Swiss-Prot record:
Annotated GO MF terms: 3'-5'-RNA exonuclease activity; magnesium ion binding; polyribonucleotide nucleotidyltransferase activity; RNA binding
UniProt KW keywords: Cytoplasm, Magnesium, Metal-binding, Nucleotidyltransferase, RNA-binding, Transferase
The species this protein was found in: Halalkalibacterium halodurans (strain ATCC BAA-125 / DSM 18197 / FERM 7344 / JCM 9153 / C-125)
PROSITE patterns xref list: KH_TYPE_1 (PS50084), S1 (PS50126)
Protein name (Swiss-Prot/TrEMBL): Polyribonucleotide nucleotidyltransferase
Gene name per UniProt: pnp
Length: 704
């Protein structure tokens, strides 16, 4: 049956948001075209007919960029879009996180949500349009989904909050917050900020949630009008008789095992109990071992959550608001420009800071305006950090997301290009993992920059907060470890300085949390951050006053912008010659600022002298000691300084008549000449005769 096309509109932050259904991608379970300004995103949701035999919910969320959306053709030989950009990967995670908690417990059908950006307006966020589209595609489909959800961007300009700020407004904003949630609660936060106090961040989140409620009402109307009836699906459930039987065999032993303080010893104790129980069912073909295993994990989860919420006991014996033992060190690696090692319990990160010339910036060319990035933070998570083996691959979504979070946390304290004309790359190597590795990498990266001599505005530390909510019992945990993250309800990462917050990231596994829990988590995080900063500053109290001897030295000079082409030369001939002769890197800005960099200060100075000679202006009436470079019948060409020469006509070589140029000068001779004129073609006319006359006149006056 042919679906009827429907269109719905609402004003969203001063721009029109339009949703179209029933025309595109009609074979998907749900599909909508979302138009926001001139941005257009097609969002679809599909699900497998049968559940998968998996211990987890197989959900995939993809945000896909098409360069035609920005009127661009992909580069390279293939001329097709390649692997997703970092922005697309982060957008996929941004949409996935608020959607994932809202599917029924035990739902195992494979679900795929895809948003394709088909047209992009830089002032109308395609990510926010895709989030609304993904929620709507699920809401109008027959796939079980306890939404809708919505998300908005919040900025703050001159103390006033702004919904979905434009590009120009974002430049002036000290907050860049994305908040998502349901009508009743918030379930995802992602933010960067310029040392903003916790109470302001909380108000920004609540301000965003008020706008979310309006968008959800809009979606509910659409779903009521065009939505399909939800399919009755089989939710995975365990046999209650089997569960009771397994509990009798394992419950008491597992309760003791989960309270072993050390991570690996605790894992070994839990696995020993599980293996013992599983062995009793190995010969029983009527009982699936996967189901027994699921029951055993359920018992562990219940006991850990009960201990935390009711008895206020954590797996490693800490208090609810207690941080694990801390250690901070710098200068770990001798030849790197800066290094920092941060350890928190059984989580350890080693960060390395590398300084480069401004020519080492990363060029970002996607759907947005081409930009360059001079500060980068990369995060690596090798398998040995958790004592396991596994394939070695490039960075996945998680690594890219954690690297971006660290970058967002540290960016507000990076010195300006004028104050510190370097490209800065940080690489965080996670060496041990037991929760909060992204926050450990932020602490280690701060230490590495201070060790490298980067004049950061203030040190930054990060901490991860957790939540376990069971009936009327609620516990907000400071500095969560791996088990608390896996079995808890929230992972709320907060990074900042003593002054305020620089980054937030919140993911939850329940439908949402309220203001009171957010407020408590932010305050506990602030207190924890102060303790961590104290520990870091014991290792290094301020950035080193000098850079590493192995870091490039950068010399800055300014020339007349009109002279830039002279420094570059035809087809880059001049600048390439300077680089070849001195071994330096040269970066030239449009305003005439030149950055010369190398490890050798002498070579920097040599390159500067060459450039100074190139841009030096010849002044009429001035005398110069030049070198004869070429001889013609009509005169001699004399180089006054590097890149600038002039002609001494044969008649201007001497006071007496000259028959042959070689009678007076030869190539390589140094002669004193005077600039007589510069013609309208820029040619310089010189005279040796005028110099001789002035010298003769001066001698006569001295004799008198």
């Amino acid at each position: 049956m042919e679906q009827e096309r429907h269109e719905f509109s609402i004003d969203w932050a001063g721009r029109k948001l339009t949703v179209e259904t029933g025309q595109l991608a009609k074979q998907a379970n749900g599909a909508v075209l979302v138009r926001y300004g001139d941005t257009a995103v097609l969002s679809t949701a599909t699900a497998s007919k049968e559940p998968k035999d998996l211990p987890f919910f197989p959900l995939t969320v993809n945000y896909e960029e098409r360069l035609y959306a920005a009127g661009k053709i992909p580069g390279g030989f293939i001329k097709r879009e390649g692997r997703p950009s970092e922005k697309a990967i982060l957008a996929s995670r941004l949409i996935d996180r608020p959607i994932r908690p809202l599917f029924p417990e035990g739902f195992r059908n494979e679900v795929q949500v895809i948003s394709i950006v088909m047209s992009v307006d830089q002032d109308c966020s395609s990510e926010m349009a895709a989030m609304v589209g993904s929620s709507l595609a699920l809401s109008i489909s027959d796939i079980p989904f306890e939404g809708p959800i919505a998300g908005v961007t919040v900025g703050r300009i001159d103390g006033q909050f702004v919904i979905n700020p434009t590009q120009d407004q974002l430049e002036k904003s000290d907050i860049h917050l994305v908040v998502a949630g349901t009508k009743d609660a918030i379930n995802m936060v992602e933010a960067g900020a310029e040392e903003v106090p916790e109470d302001v961040m909380l108000e920004a989140i609540m301000f965003g949630h008020n706008e979310i409620k309006r968008l959800i009402e809009f979606q509910e109307k659409i779903a009521a009008e065009v939505g399909k009836s939800k399919t009755d699906v089989v939710l995975k459930q365990v046999d209650p008789m089997l569960e009771q039987e397994v509990r009798v065999k394992a419950e008491e032993d597992l309760k003791q095992a989960v309270q072993v303080p050390e991570k690996h010893a605790r894992q070994d104790a839990i696995e020993a109990v599980m293996d013992k129980v599983l062995e009793t069912y190995e010969d029983n073909e009527d009982v699936p071992l996967s189901e027994v295993n699921e029951i055993l994990h359920k018992i562990v989860k219940e006991e850990v959550r009960r201990l935390i919420t009711v008895e206020k006991i954590r797996p490693d014996g800490r208090e609810i608001d207690e941080i694990r033992p801390l250690s901070s060190q710098v200068g770990i690696l001798p030849r790197t420009h800066g290094s920092g090692l941060f350890t928190r319990g059984q989580t350890q990160a080693l960060s390395i800071c590398t300084l480069g010339a401004l020519g080492d910036v990363q060029i970002l060319d996607g759907l947005g305006i081409e930009e360059s990035k001079r500060f980068m933070h990369h995060y690596n998570f090798p398998q040995f950090s958790v004592g396991e083996t596994g394939p070695i691959r490039g960075p996945g979504r998680r690594e890219i997301g954690h690297g971006a979070l660290g970058e967002r946390a540290l960016e507000p304290v990076i010195p300006s290009e004028q104050d510190f004309p370097y490209t800065i790359r940080l690489v965080s190597e996670v060496l041990e993992s037991n929760g909060s590795t992204s926050q450990a990498s932020i602490c280690a990266s701060t230490l590495a920059m201070m060790d490298a001599g980067v004049p950061i505005k203030a040190p930054v530390a990060g901490i991860a907060m957790g939540l376990v909510k069971q009936d009327e019992h609620v516990s907000v945990l400071t500095d969560i470890q791996g088990m608390e993250d896996a079995l808890g309800d929230m992972d709320f990462k907060v990074a900042g300085t003593r002054k305020g917050v620089t980054a937030l990231q919140m993911d939850i596994k329940i439908s949402g949390i309220d203001r009171a829990i957010l407020e408590q988590a932010l305050e506990q995080a602030r207190k924890g951050r102060m303790i961590i900063l104290d520990n870091m500053l014991e290792a290094i109290s301020e950035s080193r006053s000098e850079l590493s001897p192995y870091a490039p030295k950068i010399l800055t000079m300014t020339i007349n912008p009109d002279k830039i082409r002279d420094v570059i030369g035809p087809s880059g001939k001049m600048i390439n010659k300077i680089i070849e002769d001195t071994g330096v890197k040269i970066d030239i800005e449009q305003d005439g600022t030149i950055y010369i960099s190398s490890a050798d200060t002498n070579m920097n100075n040599k390159a500067r002298e060459i450039i100074e000679d190139i841009v030096r202006e010849v002044e009429v009436g001035q005398m110069y000691l030049g070198t004869v470079k070429r001889i013609e019948k009509f005169g001699a060409f004399v180089e006054l300084f590097k890149g600038k020469d002039g002609l001494v006509h044969i008649s201007q070589l001497a006071e007496e008549r000259v028959n042959k140029v070689e009678d007076v000068v030869k190539i390589g001779d140094e002669i004193l000449v005077k600039v007589m004129e510069i013609d309208n073609q820029g040619r310089v006319n010189l005279s040796r005769k005028a110099v001789l006359k002035e010298q003769k006149k001066a001698e006569e006056q001295n004799q008198k």
